[in-house]
Structure formats: C-alpha cells, structure tokens
UniProtKB/Swiss-Prot annotation:
Keyword Transcription tagged: no
Subcellular location: Cell inner membrane
Subunit description: The G.violaceus PSI reaction center is composed of one copy each of PsaA,B,C,D,E,F,L,M and Z, and forms trimeric complexes.
Any one Gene Ontology cellular component term annotated for this protein: plasma membrane
Assigned protein family: Belongs to the PsaM family.
GO biological process: photosynthesis
Protein name, per record: Photosystem I reaction center subunit XII
C-alpha cells in the first residue's frame, strides 16, 4: 500500500513538473514570437 502511494505521488509530482515546464515553454515561445 505504501509503495503504491509513494509511486502515485511521484507520478503526480512528475505530471505537475511537466505541466509547469510546458506552460513555461509556451509562454517563452510566445514572448519570443512577439
């Protein structure tokens, strides 16, 4: 049970990090485009 919770948390953290990185890249490309 504990291992499942830990892996789930790692997946959630990785997802959030990827989401933030994607948004940052989008904003950066938009700023450079202008």
């Amino acid at each position: 049970m504990a291992a499942t919770v830990v892996s789930g948390a790692q997946v959630a953290i990785a997802f959030v990090v990827a989401l933030i990185a994607g948004i940052a890249a989008l904003l950066l490309s938009t700023a450079l485009g202008k």
